[in-house]
Curated annotation (Swiss-Prot):
Subcellular locations according to the entry: Cytoplasm
Subunit organization: Monomer.
Name by which UniProt lists this protein: Arginine--tRNA ligase
SMART domains: Arg_tRNA_synt_N, DALR_1
Top-level EC class: ligase
Length: 562
């Protein structure tokens, strides 16, 4: 509903330019149209007069009065007030919210979507777990946040490419291989010959057992079969990494998370992209050698100190393949790139940005954008859950899904701002009560389905056309409050995308569900009067549609029965 108001205000500014009140070179400023905290200050407010007064040297309150007088008339606006130093407050007529409720049903699944992204390409990378063990709850939070961000960006008109970066090179992979090899040779954690820094979870024994049995792994484009040779380190490496990739993919599929691109870190070395990137940085003049190592002049690009790229032994530090990887994103045409990571990666961001800037190929500052999430604490029975027998040291995503559900796990992992620490209460997530937010929201959806089923069972035919035409019959305050809440949805979708804060969708859905439950308890719906009944069912169906659209952005289901 903000867009028509903005257009109206711009028409008023143009009228003042035309009659000489404003200089002809006065452009509409980047003004705000927002919903005040309380409706007594109006449904919407704008600071446009105060911004214009700065540009023209006018009294902002007088300019506000002049601008209001120049606004075209609108049936959607009941009255306009000037407040404080020059705020313009708009009080909307109920018909405006009735029209918006009708728009919901006309636009159906597209309600709330916009074209602000203009079909530009954005790469969203998330999860990107090392294939060294089961996905833990932190990976689950990354999956929930990243997948919701991708859905939000698509809803805002972006062409989204979902990407998973496999860190399948480095010391941790070497430790994995040595762990599986030791298990295959009959060793166990605690044995004298058990490797240092080995992984101790039961999943290592599972991999070794599968390897010794000659099992095959069905990957997307190939089948990998074990050689059963415990001395063949390369074969164990290939089998173990792909076994865990397959396990991770299984968990992500159960979590309703999919990707367009799976990118292997090892491919950067295999294809010579790491060496090629280093040579580009040398050629750009932003490196130097010292102490037998190759350094990046990262302080020239905002980092707090220069960084070693290639150590004296010839090996690369971990951020060098990260630069090569993000360079590949740029070369693949990503006008925008967003990387979702755990907050423990914070220290690497500046050096990756510095490396990309040092390439001097037109990559804009701040590309890629980063969304960092804080840790998750899992609670059961009032106590923290720290260990998983399968993983040997942490709570897995699979544990949470099996103990609660995919819907509950996704909701709880997305419900807080990414940079806030999160407590996952297993007991609460399993409750079928209004205290459980995902149950509360899904129950609102199911209630509408129940209403429609009851109407059918009672032979109370629903006429949506009549209902749309009769929304003015709903003059009570709870109906108006529900319509107002519905109308906020497109704004929330846009704001959540702009801020990269998908938890705002979850917050909004709780507020919408509360407005609906309040309306439901205060309003008999299946009344005898057909006109009134159709209007109420139309409002209920519009609520259901917005709930469905919002839950879809979260990747959470819409059960018709609870």
């Amino acid at each position: 509903m903000k867009a028509p108001l903005r257009a109206l205000i711009c028409q008023g500014i143009e009228a003042l330019r035309s009659n000489g009140t404003l200089p002809t070179n006065t452009l509409p400023p980047d003004f705000v149209v927002e919903r005040p905290k309380t409706r007594k200050h109006g449904d919407f407010a704008t600071n446009v007069a105060m911004l214009l007064s700065k540009a023209t040297g006018s009294n902002p309150r007088l300019l506000a009065q002049t601008l209001v007088a120049a606004l075209p008339t609108s049936a959607d606006i009941a009255r306009i007030e000037i407040a404080g130093p020059g705020f313009i407050n708009f009080h909307m007529h109920p018909v405006a919210y009735q029209h918006e409720t009708i728009n919901v049903l006309k636009q159906d699944n597209d309600y709330g979507r916009n074209l602000s992204g203009q079909s530009r390409t954005v790469g969203v990378e998330y999860v990107s777990a090392n294939p060294t063990g089961p996905l833990h709850v932190g990976h689950g939070r990354a999956a929930a946040i990243g997948d919701c961000l991708a859905r939000l960006l698509e809803a805002n008109g972006w062409n989204v490419k979902r990407e998973f970066y496999y860190n399948d090179a480095g010391v941790q992979i070497d430790n994995l291989v040595r762990s599986v090899q030791a298990r295959a040779r009959g060793l166990k954690p605690g044995d004298a010959l058990w490797p240092t820094d080995a992984y101790n979870g039961e999943y290592i024994a599972d991999i070794a057992k599968a390897y010794l049995a000659g099992d095959s792994i069905n990957m997307v484009d190939t089948i990998i079969t074990s050689t059963k040779n415990v001395d063949d380190t390369a074969a164990i490496h290939h089998f173990a990494v792909n076994y865990l990739r397959n396990e991770q993919n299984h968990d992500l599929a159960a979590f309703n998370v999919d990707f367009d691109i799976y990118f292997l870190e090892s491919s950067l070395y295999k294809d010579g992209k790491v060496e090629e990137t280093v040579q580009k940085l040398i050629n750009s003049g932003h490196t130097y050698e010292e102490g037998g190592a190759l350094w990046l002049k990262s302080t020239h690009f905002g980092d707090d100190k220069d960084r070693v790229m290639r150590k004296s032994d010839g090996s690369y530090t971990y951020f060098v393949p990260d630069i090569a990887y993000h360079l590949s994103k740029w070369q693949r045409g990503y006008e925008r790139a967003i990387t979702e990571l755990g907050a423990d990666h914070h220290g690497s961001l500046a050096r990756v940005h510095a490396g990309l800037q040092a390439l001097e190929i037109g990559i804009p500052p701040g590309w890629p954008e980063y969304v960092l999430h804080q840790m998750v604490t899992v609670m059961r029975g009032g106590e923290e859950v720290k260990l998983s027998k399968r993983s040997g040291g942490y709570v897995t995503l699979r544990d949470l899904i099996e103990e609660t559900s995919t819907d509950a796990t996704r909701w709880f992992l997305i419900a807080r701002k990414p940079d806030s620490q999160l407590t996952f209460d297993i007991d609460l997530a399993r409750q079928k009560s209004n205290d459980n937010p995902v149950f509360y929201v899904q129950y609102a959806y199911a209630r509408v389905c129940s209403l429609m089923h009851q109407a059918h069972e009672k032979n109370l035919n629903y006429d949506q056309t009549s209902g749309m035409a009769s929304l003015d019959q709903l003059s009570d305050n709870t109906s108006l409050c529900l319509m107002i809440e519905i109308s906020r949805y497109p704004e929330i979708v846009q704001i959540a995308c702009e801020l990269l804060e998908p938890h705002l969708i979850a917050q909004y859905l709780r507020e919408l569900a509360h407005a609906f439950h309040t309306w439901y308890h205060n309003t008999p719906v299946l009344v005898e009067n057909a006109v009134e009944r159709n209007a109420k069912l139309t409002l209920a169906c519009a609520t259901r549609q917005v709930l469905a659209n919002g839950l879809n952005l979260l990747g959470v289901g819409t059960p018709e029965k609870m």
